[in-house]
Amino acid sequence: AATVGGRGSFSANHLESLRLGKAAGGGGAAVPHTGTGPLVPALVGGRVTAAVGYSMLGGQSTDQVRVLGGAADERVETLPDAPTFKELGYDIVGGAFRGVAAPKGTDPQIISKLAEAFSETNKIIAEKQRQLGFVMTYATGEDAYTLVGRMKENYEGILQEIAAQKKKK
């Protein structure tokens, strides 16, 4: 049986690996790691048969690792030969989310200033992240709610399946 290394239990890449395994008609045992960094040595060392990480550029530096696909809408610029999971026939688009919130009832002008400040900061961060192989998406307002709703929809089913399996034990 396949063993799939990922970052932590119930992290975005752990849940995405479970979704991908289900979509591919298989499964495999999830092997949590303390971060993305330990995944490549685990894969190269044969401790796992596959790895799901936020950025696999480090793995590309060895001829023993090949990136099979990405969970983005479009191919990752820094990994142009790696197809998206959608290109491979799996409706899997996902990733990690970082959000900033303010208390309900916060003055709309303050919200606007915060959004502007984070937008400018994000431009700086996004370029560095792109160089590291990450795909950055910036969303505010309704777009952010839509993004969170999509993530909830993606993960809800797999989390319910995990809960049902735990009840059976």
Predicted regions and their residues:
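Conserved, function-defining micro-sites of small-solute handling proteins
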Residues: A1-K169
